[in-house]
Structures are given as C-alpha cells and as structure tokens.
Amino acid sequence: MSKFLDTAIEAIAAREILDSRGRPTIEAEVHLANGVVGLAQVPSGASTGSFEAHELRDGDKSRYGGKGVLKAVKNVKEALAPKLLGLDALNQELLDRTMIAIDGSPNKSSLGANAILGVSLAAAKAGAESLDIPLYRYLGGPLANLLPVPLMNVINGGAHASNNVDFQEFMIVPIGATSFREALRWGAEVFATLSQVLDEKGLLTGVGDEGGFAPNLESNQVALELLVAAIKKAGYKPGEEVALALDVAASEFYKNGQYVYDGKPHAPAEFIDYLGQLVDQYPIVSIEDGLHEEDWQSWQLLTQKLGSQVQLVGDDLFVTNATRLQRGIEEKAANAILIKLNQIGSLTETLETIDLATRNSIRSVISHRSGETEDTTIADLAVATRAGQIKTGSLCRSERVAKYNRLLRIEDELGDRAVYAGAVGLGPK
C-alpha cells in the first residue's frame, strides 16, 4: 500500500491555544498511518445564539477568568481519541457520527462542540492531504470552482465593539466585481477610504473584534451614510458596484417583546417598518438576524414584506441546525442561512445543513466568528459548497485577512475555471 493510501488514524492530539481576542480555544491534530498530520483550530463567538451547540469552558476563575478549555482538550485525548484510532480518516461521516454518539447529548454538552469540531476538521484536512488535493476539492469535488462574494464588516457595533451603535455589523459587498481578486481590492480601497472619512469627521478609527472601525455614532443611519460616502469617494457606485449589508443581531437588544434601539423600545411591526425604510433609503442587499431568534411570527412578517427585495439571513435563528432550518422553511421565515461550523460542531452536520438549504432554495453564507484563528477552513468550505458568499470580517487583522488570502490562492489554482459569484448573479440579492 502506498504512503498516501494508508489513511487510518494513528494518533490524535489537542492543546489549548489563544484566539484573536486572547481567549483560549482548541487546536487539534489528527495523525495518520501514512505520516500525514491534519491540524485545525476552533473559533469562538461573542454574540451567540441560544440554540448553538455547547462550547465547553473550564469555569476555573483562576485561569483565563474561567474561559480555559483544558476540559475539552482532555475530552479529545481521553474520550474521543481511544474510540477513533484505527478508523479511516477518509470516512468523514463515520468519524463525526462516532464522536456525536460518544458525546450522547443533544447539543454536544458532554464533551464540548469545540472538542468534536477540532477533531472533525483536522481529520478532513488530513484526508485531503493524503489524497494530495486541496481541501475545497476534497469536500466539493470537481464542481468546486465558485469564489464567494465577501460581505466585509467595516463598521462594528453591538456585541462586537465598545461603542453606542445598536446594530452589530455594517458591511460592504463588492457585487459588481468580475473576480474575487478584484472584489478584494475594491473592498480594501473602500475600507482605506472609510478610515479617511472617519478621520476627517474627528471620529475614532480604532477597530472592533472583526477588524471594522468602531466609532461612536448618533444612529444606525449615520453608519450607513458613512459607508455610502466612502464608496463614492473611493470611486465606486453604491448599489451597482459596491452594496451594503447589515447584521442587526436583534436578539441582543430584544427586551420584553420589544426592540430597544436609539434608546427607545419599539414593537416588532414598527421595527420591521424601520428596516424597510433603511432598505428603501440605502443600497442594502442583505439583512442578517433582523429579529429575535424566537420571534418566529415576526420573522414571517419580515420575510413577506422584504424577502423579495433583499436577502434575509438567519444566524441566531437557525444556528446552522438542520432542525431549526426545516422549521424556517416550513414557516417561510428568512430566505438565507448563516453557516458557522462551531454552531453545530461537526463538518458532516454543517454539510447536511447546507444541503438542506440548497435543496429548498435557501442561500448559504459561510461565516467566521468574532474570536478567530489563523485557520482558513471556511475559505475552502465556501468554495467547496458553492455557497457564493462569505463573511470573514474586515480588511485588517491577520486572522481575517488569512481567509481572504486563502481565497486568492484558490482562485489562482483554479485559473480559468474560477468563477466569481458576483459576476454571475449568485451573491446576495
């Protein structure tokens, strides 16, 4: 048997490392009999949905304020590794199902979704390297050639920044570019111009968790006005070449059945009208988490009102969970889903959720988390699944830029076969 074909798992290792916010996370290694080693790091969110898979933390206040992950590391070494040794790394579903069964809980709270996901991703990387093919080809096959439109978070608010802005993310979307390389350049130029615009107005240009600027602004509309001004000043046409997108993260300011923004409570119908006004006034193509994760009735109303005009993305609403997505499909709530690997906790379940979305004409947006690492798996995942969209932060901070640079390399590898989703109308509406 050749070196590359002996893909049995020989050893599994894990360690506690730091993410981009200086908080602990897991790094996992999967060693194969052929000498190949797959390495993966697990991200962590700041604004998390109530129905996400459980991220296991130590709770020991004497280490990292209780945020340590030594328990999850121990679970990889003592609970998962002994049961996975000898299994074929190329059988991703068997590996993932085995880990899910060992955990035995409905939300991976026994061993930790962070423990399971680390091994899941490391095994996939080892499998790809064993076959001497890139991860996007390993996961997506010969049709994996669609480069995603980036939704670039350039103004941070909400839980991602220490400022007074209600909405969590204000994004620029280079829909009019003809290639990913061009789209990235457009985004970088608008980002640099936005820095100048903020500076000219005496606003701070410090950045939030995801690399976007985090100034104190009078309202959400002011943030949108600044983006439109930066797009124009950079030499691009708002809405035609570079559009806007929002992550409202409404669950973060939902209290007692009301949406509290601009310092005042508003009824759901009133808030939906407000979002509609923003869509009418600005070149917005996508709104994420426009309502609370359990406000299903209002989600239906929002989708009826704005679903034909803009992309309505469920993040906290769906948490990359096929069961919750199925409910959304049946109730006609949202028309797109945000995909975060650590929300569900395994590669297999992530791919199943994307497949369910695709079969029901629900668009998928592959996403990072606010606590990231240098791991670039989501770039490959976006191409592998032909999702057509990716969220991986701003145009600064190396843990964000690493994903963009990986997509540049993939585009170069594909050569003439590479297709940019924005150029063929497969980005956000």
Swiss-Prot record:
It is found in: Cytoplasm; Secreted; Cell surface. It catalyses: (2R)-2-phosphoglycerate = phosphoenolpyruvate + H2O. Binds a second Mg(2+) ion via substrate during catalysis. Keywords: Cytoplasm, Glycolysis, Lyase, Magnesium, Metal-binding, Secreted. One of its GO terms (cellular component) is phosphopyruvate hydratase complex. Its cofactor is Mg(2+). Mg(2+) binds at D247, E288, D315. One of its GO terms (molecular function) is magnesium ion binding. The keyword Magnesium applies. InterPro entries: Enolase (IPR000941), Enolase-like_C_sf (IPR036849), Enolase-like_N (IPR029017), Enolase_C (IPR020810), Enolase_CS (IPR020809), Enolase_N (IPR020811). It comes from the Bacteria. It is an enzyme of class 4 (lyase). This is Enolase. The lineage of its organism: Bacteria, Bacillati, Cyanobacteriota, Cyanophyceae, Nostocales. The gene is eno.
